[in-house]
Amino acid sequence: MTGREFEQYMCKLFDKNGFWALNIPRNESGAQPFDIVAIRGDEVYTIDCKVCSGAARFPLSRVEDNQLLAFEKVFWRTNAKIGFMVYWSGEIYFLRRADIVKAIENKQASIKLTYNDLFCTVVNEVF
């Protein structure tokens, strides 16, 4: 699955679960901090979608400075769930802002994808 396909999949998945979901268009530099905003009532997600292969880890080198800044601005102003949706080996993991920030502060190179972070398994019926 490509990154663009994963973004489209996540929008459809949110939509099927009663969310209004917007895949944010890329600007000329491609540097928007989030790929998707999804809202259902008071529940809000602001997420960036990443596709990983190889080991079950998310390399923190893939986190951009503008994303960290946006994470903090959204965190301090909303109750949104903020972070990365990571597609790996047919499963989707949600890495939360707090875990990402903590790992960066601890100078970790990556975050292990674990069962605790599992958001869902990819289901083809969404398409």
At which residue positions do the language-model features occur?
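Acidic-basic catalytic patches of nuclease active cores, encompassing PD-(D/E)XK
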Residues: 1-27
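Active-site metal-binding core of divalent-cation-utilizing nuclease and nuclease-like domains
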Residues: 20-42
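Short connector loops at helix/strand junctions that flank enzyme active sites
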Residues: 31-33, 42-46, 66, 77-79
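Conserved catalytic cores of phosphodiester-cleaving nucleases, focusing on short active-site segments
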Residues: 36-38, 42-55
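Mg2+/Mn2+-dependent nuclease catalytic core
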Residues: 52-70
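Nucleic-acid nuclease catalytic cores
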Residues: 72-100
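N-terminal prepro-regions of secreted/extracellular proteins
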Residues: 102-104, 108-110
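Charged phosphate-binding loop/patch that engages nucleotide di/tri-phosphates or the phosphate backbone
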Residues: 109-127
